């Protein structure tokens, strides 16, 4: 049996960094589902798709997302840093509420996680994508802490942003993600919640590794 680790939480809670490090420590696959929503968000925005449209299937039929060796490819082309911009994040949150987008990506994610040792992170991994995951984690942190992390990350990448704008976007994304009708951001009943506000990345990773070894001891 595979050991599947689901890590969920709001924007800026540390999911991506933590999940990647956990996967590296365990020597298993890592799936960034947030990147997949950013890919789709940018694709739909460039196509001029109206998020209020009853169907977005026609806009998605020519989009092929492949996952190979931890990397994403869109119609055969490697995905770059263009999906890491604040704009891409807002489009991801905007279009993620549409049922066609959820169905399109959930199907791909379920297939990727099927019978594989993997760390998958996002907002509905433990509740929708792999609800029977062997280990479920829900990371949280205050909006201010998450905004500060995101602000410094963007500054380091050369983006000119204001902390107040980043904080506002974090709060807006929280509202969009938690209030959407389909697969809203929520903690799975059996998930272990970890508040990362006052913890280092290493401390969070160590806590998750310990839990994984307790539940999947025969593999790690």
Enumerate the predicted regions with their spans.
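Hydrophobic positions on the alpha1 helix immediately C-terminal to the Walker A/P-loop
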Residues: 18
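N-terminal phosphate/diphosphate-binding loop that engages ATP/GTP or pyrophosphate donors
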Residues: 24-86
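Residue-level signal for inorganic ion chemistry
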Residues: 34, 76, 105, 119, ...
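ATP-dependent NMP and nucleoside kinases share a basic, alpha-helical "lid"
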Residues: 83-92, 96-157
């Amino acid at each position: 049996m595979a050991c599947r680790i689901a890590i969920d939480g709001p924007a800026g809670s540390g999911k991506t960094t933590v999940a990647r490090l956990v996967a590296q420590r365990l020597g298993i696959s890592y799936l960034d589902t947030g990147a997949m929503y950013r890919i789709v968000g940018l694709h739909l925005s460039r196509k001029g798709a109206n998020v209020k449209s009853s169907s977005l299937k026609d806009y998605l039929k020519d989009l092929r997302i492949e996952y190979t060796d931890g990397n994403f490819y869109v119609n055969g082309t490697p995905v770059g840093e263009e999906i890491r911009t604040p704009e891409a994040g807002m489009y991801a949150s905007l279009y993620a509420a549409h049922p066609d987008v959820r169905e399109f990506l959930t199907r791909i994610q379920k297939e990727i996680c099927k019978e594989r040792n993997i760390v998958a992170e996002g907002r509905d991994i433990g509740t929708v994508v792999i609800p029977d995951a062997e280990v479920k984690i829900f990371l949280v942190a205050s909006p201010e802490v998450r905004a500060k992390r995101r602000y410094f990350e963007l500054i380091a990448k050369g983006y000119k942003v204001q902390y107040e704008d980043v904080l506002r976007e974090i709060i807006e994304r929280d509202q969009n993600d938690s209030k959407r009708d389909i697969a809203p951001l929520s903690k799975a009943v059996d998930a272990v919640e970890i508040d990362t506000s006052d913890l280092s990345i290493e401390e969070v990773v160590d806590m998750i590794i310990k839990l994984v070894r307790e539940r999947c001891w025969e593999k790690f």
